[in-house]
Amino acid sequence: EDMDDKENDIVLLSVSKIIPFKNHPFKVDDEQLDQLKNSIAENGILHPLIVRCLDDGDGFELISGHRRKRACELLGIKEVPCIIKELNDDMASVLMVDANIQRENILPSEKAKAYRMKYDALKHQGKQIEMLGNTAELVGKKAGDSGRTVQRYYRLSYLCPDLLNEVDEKKLTFNSGVILAGL
């Protein structure tokens, strides 16, 4: 094993030094947060959070573990186990989406914003991705969604917040939302 490989070392970091991921599209406070809080109170944190260093070198940006961090804050836990990754903005976006997209009960608005973030990040990578084929297919792969489904969610992400909320609350169908977003 390579002794220089610090990528997967687990370190304890102060919760106060960790800021949320910019434009994180997933809701953190939900009914599942209580279950998570109880689990952490009983068993501790089973999976380390994933962070990257902030540009100013003072603190960290959270990539995966927003709900775990929130649960720890509510429990008064001051330090959390973390893995520090070296990632550019695009790769950080991709990892953040992939870490969250497989959760149950994701709202259509969350999935739409997440897919758009990942799609834009992959597109931004450009040449490296072209060899791998259709960007939309790549975006949906982790969650088992087709490229066509990803494109529909991507379009939905342009819907105004009020109507997007209607889709989340099932007052407006997903298909209607996609059509309205395309107008």
Regions found by a protein language model. Name each.
Residues 25-27, 34, 70-158, 165, ...:
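Amphipathic, charge-rich alpha-helical segments that serve as recognition/docking helices
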Residues 170:
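Basic, low-complexity intrinsically disordered segments
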Residues 1-85, 92-102:
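Short, charged/polar connector segments at secondary-structure boundaries
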